[in-house]
A protein has these predicted regions:
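A cross-kingdom C-terminal cell-surface attachment/processing module
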Residues: 330-346
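A conserved glycine-rich beta-strand in the N-terminal activation segment of trypsin-fold
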Residues: 35-55, 177
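Conserved catalytic-core segment of clan PA serine endopeptidases
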Residues: 20-31, 41-44, 69-114
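Chymotrypsin/trypsin-fold serine protease catalytic domain
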Residues: 100-168, 206, 210-214
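C-terminal subregion of chymotrypsin/trypsin-like serine protease catalytic domains
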Residues: 53, 58, 177, 181-251, ...
C-alpha cells in the first residue's frame, strides 16, 4: 500500500466531512427535534425545512407546498411520516400573480414526539436584532445554524423581511421553510419563515428574505385553531415541571386541561381568557412515572414518557456529547473503510 494514496483518501474524507458544516454551525438535531425535513419519497434532491407546531402540524415556505412532490416528513430520529394534508396561505400570490406571502402548513395523521418548542411571534421587529436560521440546506442529513441579524421590512410589501447573513454562515437550497428565530423572554420565537437568499452583485454581500408570522397570523389560526405545545415533557427530581404553551386558536379561549397521573397545581393558563398567540403556563406535579396532561381530548403532552428506539437516528437519545456533528460519519471509520477499499484493489 502506498502512503500517498492513503493520504489522498484521508484528505478527501476530511473534505467530505467538512462539507456538512460549510453553510453554518452544526447543531444537535435531537436537541432541536421540532425542526423537521420535508422530503420527496422518490427524489432525495427535493427537500425543505419545516418546524413542528401544535403536535402534528409543521410550518414551512409556501413554495415548498406549491411546487409539489414533498410527501414525507422526516423526524430527528430519522422516522419518515407521510403527510396527510397541506395548505398554502390565500395570499401566496398578489394581484399581479407575483409570489407574496410565502408560507405553507403541512400535517401528519397523528401527533409526533418532540420536546423542543419555538413559539410564534407576531410583534414588530427592530433592526439589528440577533436571530438564527436552522436548516438542512446543502447538508440534507445534518441540521446547521446560520447566525444572522434582522435587517429591515420591505419598503412596500411589509410582509417581506430581510436578514443580514454574512459570508461565513448563510442559507442555501433546502433551507426554504426554515424558521427565523429570536430569543424573547427566555423562549425561542419564530418571527418569519425563510423564503430565499439574495446576493448584491456589486458588493457580493449576502442577505436572506422571508415572510413574517405577523402577516399570516389569520391563516395560521384558521388552519390550526388549537394549542401549540411540546408533546413531551419531564418532571424534575421533585416531580414538578412548568410547561409553557401558546394559543393558536381563532378566538379567545379558557383553560380546560386535566391530568392523568399528573396534577395541575397552578400556572397562568388558569387565570382567565387567553388571546390568540398569547402564551401561558401550567405548573404540574407527578410521582415521576408516566402520565399525560390533556389540553383537550386530542391535544396531549406526555409526561415522563419512556424513550423508544425506532431504529433510526439517535433513537431519541438526548445526550449532547455526540462527536459526529449532526450525523456525519467519524473520520477514523471512514479512513479504515478507505484502507479496506485499497486492499481489495491490490
Amino acid at each position: 500500500m502506498r502512503l500517498p494514496s492513503l493520504s489522498l483518501i484521508a484528505l478527501s474524507l476530511l473534505s467530505a466531512s467538512s462539507y456538512a458544516v460549510e453553510n453554518g454551525t452544526p447543531v444537535d438535531w435531537s436537541q432541536n427535534d421540532d425542526t423537521v425535513r420535508l422530503d420527496n419519497s422518490t427524489n432525495k434532491s427535493l427537500y425543505c425545512t419545516a418546524t413542528l407546531i401544535s403536535g402534528r402540524y409543521a410550518i414551512t415556505a409556501g413554495h415548498c407546498v406549491d411546487d409539489g412532490g414533498l410527501n414525507i416528513m422526516t423526524l430527528s430520529n430519522s422516522e419518515n411520516v407521510p403527510l396527510s394534508a397541506q395548505w398554502i396561505t390565500p395570499e401566496y400570490t398578489d394581484e399581479y400573480g407575483r409570489r407574496a406571502k410565502d408560507v405553507g402548513i403541512v400535517s401528519v395523521e397523528d401527533s409526533v414526539d418532540y420536546r423542543h418548542i419555538q413559539f410564534l411571534n407576531i410583534d414588530e421587529q427592530s433592526e439589528s436584532e440577533p436571530m438564527v436560521i436552522r436548516g438542512f440546506g446543502g447538508t440534507i442529513d445534518s441540521l446547521n445554524q446560520a447566525d444572522s441579524t434582522f435587517s429591515n421590512y420591505h419598503w412596500a410589501d411589509h410582509y417581506t423581511v430581510y436578514a443580514d447573513t454574512g459570508d461565513d454562515s448563510h442559507t442555501t437550497g433546502g433551507d426554504s421553510g426554515a424558521a427565523w428565530t429570536i430569543s424573547h423572554d427566555g423562549n425561542e420565537e419564530i418571527i418569519a419563515i425563510h423564503n430565499g437568499k439574495l446576493t448584491n452583485p456589486n458588493t457580493m454581500e449576502r442577505s436572506a428574505y422571508g415572510t413574517t408570522i405577523q402577516s399570516v397570523q389569520d391563516f395560521i389560526t384558521e388552519t390550526i385553531d388549537g394549542w401549540h405545545y411540546p408533546t413531551l415533557a419531564d418532571t424534575d427530581a421533585n416531580g414538578k415541571a412548568t410547561i409553557t404553551i401558546q394559543s393558536l386558536h381563532r378566538d379567545e379561549v379558557v383553560d380546560t386541561a386535566w391530568g392523568d397521573n399528573v396534577t395541575i397545581i397552578g400556572g397562568s393558563c388558569l387565570d382567565g381568557l387567553i388571546k390568540p398567540f398569547n402564551k401561558c403556563t401550567y405548573d404540574i406535579e407527578s410521582d415521576g412515572t408516566q402520565g399525560e396532561l390533556y389540553l383537550t381530548d386530542d391535544e396531549v403532552i406526555h409526561i415522563n414518557k419512556p424513550i423508544e428506539n425506532t431504529g433510526g437516528g439517535d433513537g431519541g437519545n438526548n445526550n449532547t456529547d455526540n462527536d459526529d456533528s449532526g450525523g456525519s460519519m467519524g473520520f477514523w471509520p471512514l479512513l479504515l473503510l478507505g484502507i479496506a477499499t485499497l486492499r481489495r484493489k491490490r
